[in-house]
């Protein structure tokens, strides 16, 4: 699968580690090494990171003091903080990285320009897409799906703490059943929390497969993309 183009979505919470907040540099280093293994296999990589380890727009707006729009913009800025951290970690690992933001902040990153992003990918650079879609009321899952479609990614990978999609939370229910493969319709209609409905609908409309996999299993991303080993993931298509 040489020259495959993928977009990997990491949750912000994943960066927090055991502390549950902030950024754990050991996890950053682990992720950057996983990304490096993809680049060395001639896989073009785009990245979107959430901001939940710093702030969530919905949570910030819960008591009505902060408006939802402002809360969401705060969340977008949190993804930029995570993006800078990821850029540093990937560069420390020896990768060439560019970050593009949906909200202009030229002192920190390039503005999101689709053609430029694609050119970076073609040159073997990792591209981090930050600040969500630039609009409130849209999740970073939706931003990841949107960017994946825009850059022509063959697949979007949602890197999580579990090895796929289950019919219920495997951390709470010992009898949870793993769903190896499911349709977009199942993901939408059965209320299975793969991504939010907007993300899944966008993926469905553009025939973009969604892979859900365990980000903490070393070598898992490369094994899935290069060897087609689907044992440690689920696919929505």
From Swiss-Prot:
Pathway terms, separated by semicolons: Pyrimidine metabolism; CTP biosynthesis via de novo pathway; UDP from UMP (UMPK route): step 1/1
Pfam family, one: AA_kinase
UniProt note on regulation of activity: Allosterically activated by GTP. Inhibited by UTP.
Keyword line: Allosteric enzyme, ATP-binding, Cytoplasm, Kinase, Nucleotide-binding, Pyrimidine biosynthesis, Transferase
Residues where ATP binds: 9-12, 52, 56, 160, 166, 169
An MF annotation (GO) of this entry: ATP binding
CDD domains: AAK_UMPK-PyrH-Ec
Catalytic activity: UMP + ATP = UDP + ADP
GO biological process: 'de novo' CTP biosynthetic process; UDP biosynthetic process
Residues noted as binding UMP in the record, renumbered to the chain: 51, 72, 133-140
Superkingdom classification of source: Bacteria
Subcellular compartments: Cytoplasm
GO cellular component, one term: cytosol
Recorded coiled-coil stretches: none
Region (Involved in allosteric activation by GTP): 17-22
Entry EC number(s): 2.7.4.22
Subunit details: Homohexamer.
Cited function: Catalyzes the reversible phosphorylation of UMP to UDP.
Family under the similarity heading: Belongs to the UMP kinase family.
Protein name per Swiss-Prot or TrEMBL: Uridylate kinase
Organism whose genome encodes this protein: Sulfurimonas denitrificans (strain ATCC 33889 / DSM 1251)
């Amino acid at each position: 699968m040489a020259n495959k183009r993928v977009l990997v979505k990491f949750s912000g919470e994943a960066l927090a580690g055991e502390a549950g907040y902030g950024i754990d540099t050991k996890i950053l280093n682990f992720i950057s090494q996983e990304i490096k293994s993809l680049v060395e296999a001639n896989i073009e990589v785009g990245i979107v990171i959430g901001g939940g380890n710093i702030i969530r727009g919905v949570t910030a707006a819960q008591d009505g003091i902060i408006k939802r729009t402002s809360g969401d913009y705060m969340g977008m800025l949190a993804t930029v903080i995570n993006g800078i951290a990821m850029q540093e970690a990937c560069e420390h690992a020896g990768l060439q990285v560019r970050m593009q933001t949906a909200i202009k902040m030229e002192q920190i990153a390039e503005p999101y320009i689709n053609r430029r992003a694609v050119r970076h990918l073609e040159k073997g650079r990792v591209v981090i897409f930050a600040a969500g879609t630039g609009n409130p009321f849209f999740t970073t899952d939706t931003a990841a799906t949107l960017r994946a479609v825009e850059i022509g990614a063959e697949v979007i990978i949602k890197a999580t703490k579990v090895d796929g999609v289950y019919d219920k939370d495997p951390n709470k229910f010992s009898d949870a059943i793993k769903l190896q493969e499911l349709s977009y319709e199942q993901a939408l209609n059965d209320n299975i929390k793969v991504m939010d409905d907007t993300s899944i609908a966008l993926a469905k409309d553009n025939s973009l497969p969604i892979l859900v996999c365990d980000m903490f299993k070393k070598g898992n991303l490369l094994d899935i993309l290069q060897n087609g080993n689907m044992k440690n993931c689920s696919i929505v298509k």
